[in-house]
């Protein structure tokens, strides 16, 4: 399951970041078409390092780091 902090691979072929791995910044629960905001290490042609994707366009490759109890 994709959640905040997960590492995901992009499956949208027309995307600049196709097959790249990024980190999920947030997931919108309001019902919009592209609810998953993903941040990347590199920037695209417009110097942007994030983009919105649908849940079908991302696949989780690594779960988020678990929170350590104090």
From Swiss-Prot:
Membrane topology type? Peripheral membrane protein
Q: Which Gene3D superfamilies match?
A: 2.30.30.50
- Work out whether the entry's keyword set contains Membrane: yes
Q: Name one GO cellular component term.
A: cyanelle thylakoid membrane
Query: Which GO biological process categories is it annotated with?
Result: photosynthesis
Keyword list, A-Z: Cyanelle, Membrane, Photosynthesis, Photosystem I, Plastid, Thylakoid
Q: Where in the cell is it found?
A: Plastid, Cyanelle thylakoid membrane
SUPFAM superfamilies, sorted: Electron transport accessory proteins
Q: Which HAMAP family match?
A: PSI_PsaE (MF_00613)
Similarity section? Belongs to the PsaE family.
Q: Which NCBIfam families match?
A: PRK02749.1
Function comment: Stabilizes the interaction between PsaC and the PSI core, assists the docking of the ferredoxin to PSI and interacts with ferredoxin-NADP oxidoreductase.
Give the protein's recorded name. Photosystem I reaction center subunit IV
Q: Which organism is it from?
A: Cyanophora paradoxa
Gene designation: psaE
């Amino acid at each position: 399951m994709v959640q905040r902090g997960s590492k995901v691979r992009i499956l949208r072929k027309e995307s600049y970041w196709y097959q790249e791995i990024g980190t999920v910044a947030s997931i919108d629960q309001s019902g919009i078409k592209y609810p998953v905001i993903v941040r990347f290490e590199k920037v695209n042609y417009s110097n942007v390092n994030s983009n919105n994707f649908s849940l079908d366009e991302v696949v989780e490759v690594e779960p988020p780091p678990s929170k350590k109890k104090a």
